[in-house]
UniProtKB/Swiss-Prot annotation:
NDH-1 is composed of 14 different subunits. Subunits NuoA, H, J, K, L, M, N constitute the membrane sector of the complex. The gene is nuoK. Belongs to the complex I subunit 4L family. One of its GO terms (biological process) is ATP synthesis coupled electron transport. This is NADH-quinone oxidoreductase subunit K. It comes from Neisseria gonorrhoeae (strain ATCC 700825 / FA 1090).
Amino acid sequence: MITLTHYLVLGALLFGISAMGIFMNRKNVLVLLMSIELMLLAVNFNFIAFSQHLGDTAGQIFVFFVLTVAAAESAIGLAIMVLVYRNRQTINVADLDELKG
């Protein structure tokens, strides 16, 4: 039988993988965005696991709000990334150190 501990371990593994993705690859904006999204999904997975374990639907409802914000974040982040790529021909974070007013 799968218990709450199994779900929490899986959520922690997903969170750890996404944290490794952020810390090991700080150069590519696309990989950073994907790692942040994976981190949010790991947190949502834990919300759903606790919600199911406690028999309360509040955690599941909260997940819908988090997914909505994550979708908006992804859309805005990808739009900014496309604009930066059109102007600079790169999505390398190290090359994005100049601000123009």
